[in-house]
């Protein structure tokens, strides 16, 4: 079709430029960027400027539909087509002689650029090539950009010796022999996080949740993570490195855990960020495992597998339990007769939940919600309050330090907060899967009748918790 023909034509054009440049012994720069950087105004006519310096310019289109180039030695989880093409272009450039160099444009560290730039830099540096990054929108004029490109061009003319190549390094793989390692995980929420330990213990793993983030988390995160990555990622990296540097853990018997959604959110690539930070900090001997559902996990971890068939009922009830407790607390804290009563009840019922989870008795969590509803009713005065919802990136809206305690501030002003809950984040998977299959973006892995059966199972659990919780007079299903 027309699109395939276009891809073929533009790739052949780039290949012709390379052949002709080599015949004439002229330098070539592969100028990579996002699709919108093809607009001359957005890129400030950088491609034209480079050409005026006597250098032939090609784009990452030279590797379009090229199946011979593989990018296996990377930390990055491949998410978007243009990202994958830039990675392949970097790998292709790394294999070429000194007459071909790589320059990448970025604007405002957009989207997953922070992860991508780190990966491209590593690919080139491991193969003894420089990485030139042009942050287009960080300057008021292109004079400084022109100076950087001119410096690269002059170095090409001097044909410097190619640097030595280095092997790809990554953190240790979590093997079957590592099942007894203590697994540390970053803190996320005051609600679900405390219950992770009993859930994991039920599956045979010893997990320890790290303390909530603080100023030192941000400071360490900025030291070891790309400074243009999103704030939650900075905090998570800081928490993990601080823990490993604390001396509290036997590093030969410790592992790190991080969630992985498998979608197009940047959170999917927190794994890459953490591994790179751990290597830079000297903790390459500590394995990293990812937590996800089914095939959404993109990490080699042969020794780590959650027993979903065993833990799913109690894990689902724990999720609904903590979502419900969060609603109870935020409706009560602005109506409590005695200051601190809502927090004490919240903590009480979070502690009570540990034993039913360890004993794999999900029905007891429903019973505790019934008891909690009565106790929360008792501590509340009849009062109408203004109500505000809090939305945002998943870690940001759940983590108090990440959102600078905005929820607590609103509560102190007498405003009832409709808190973020985790359930919708997981339920969207049903909609996403169905639409991806319709658009032929994903193969059908589960028969629809099984998926529908599982959905109805979850829906019944939700209805049960809503009925039970509705005895609390300020509960919103």
Question: Which role does the model predict for each range below?
Answer:
Residues 1-477:
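An N-terminal assembly and electron-transfer interface module characteristic of large anaerobic redox
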């Amino acid at each position: 079709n027309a699109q395939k023909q276009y891809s073929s034509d533009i790739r052949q054009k780039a290949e012709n430029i390379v052949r002709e440049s080599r015949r004439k012994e002229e330098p070539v720069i592969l100028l990579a960027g996002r699709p919108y950087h093809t607009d001359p105004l957005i890129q400030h006519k950088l491609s034209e400027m480079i050409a005026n310096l006597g250098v032939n310019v090609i784009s990452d289109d030279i590797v379009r539909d090229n199946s011979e180039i593989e990018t296996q030695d990377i930390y990055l989880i491949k998410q978007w087509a243009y990202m994958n093409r830039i990675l392949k272009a970097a790998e292709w450039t790394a294999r070429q002689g000194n007459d071909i160099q790589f320059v990448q444009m970025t604007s405002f560290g957009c989207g997953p650029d922070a992860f991508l730039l780190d990966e491209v830099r590593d690919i080139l540096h491991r193969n003894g090539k420089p990485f030139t990054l042009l942050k287009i929108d960080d300057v008021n004029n292109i004079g400084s950009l022109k100076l950087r490109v001119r410096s690269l061009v002059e170095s090409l003319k001097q044909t410097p010796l190619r640097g030595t190549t280095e092997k790809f390094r990554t953190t240790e793989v979590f093997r079957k022999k590592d099942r007894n390692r203590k697994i540390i995980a970053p803190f996320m929420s005051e609600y679900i996080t405390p219950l992770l330990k009993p859930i994991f213990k039920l599956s045979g793993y010893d997990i320890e949740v790290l303390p909530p983030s603080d100023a030192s988390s941000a400071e360490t995160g900025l030291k070891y993570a790309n400074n243009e990555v999103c704030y939650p990622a900075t905090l998570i990296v800081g928490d993990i490195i601080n823990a490993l540097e604390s001396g509290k853990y036997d590093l030969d018997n410790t592992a790190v855990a991080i969630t992985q959604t498998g979608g197009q959110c940047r959170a999917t690539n927190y794994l890459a960020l953490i591994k790179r930070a751990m290597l830079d900090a000297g903790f390459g001997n500590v394995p990293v495992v990812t937590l996800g559902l089914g095939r959404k996990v993109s990490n080699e971890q042969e020794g780590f597998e959650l027993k979903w068939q065993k833990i799913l009922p109690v894990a689902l009830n724990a999720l609904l339990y903590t979502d419900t407790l969060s609603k109870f607390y935020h409706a009560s804290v602005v109506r409590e007769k005695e200051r601190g009563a809502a927090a004490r009840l919240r903590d009480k019922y979070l502690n009570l939940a540990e034993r039913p989870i360890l004993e794999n008795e999900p029905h007891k969590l429903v019973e505790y919600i019934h008891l909690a509803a009565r106790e929360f009713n008792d501590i509340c005065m009849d009062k109408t309050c203004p109500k505000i919802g809090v939305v945002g990136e998943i870690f940001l809206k759940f983590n108090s330090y990440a959102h600078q305690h905005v929820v607590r501030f609103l509560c102190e002003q007498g405003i009832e907060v409709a808190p973020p809950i985790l359930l919708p984040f997981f339920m969207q998977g049903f909609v996403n899967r169905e639409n991806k299959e319709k658009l032929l973006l994903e193969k059908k892995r589960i028969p629809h009748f099984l998926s529908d059966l599982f959905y109805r199972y979850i829906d019944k659990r939700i209805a049960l918790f809503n009925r039970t919780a509705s005895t609390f007079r300020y509960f919103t299903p």
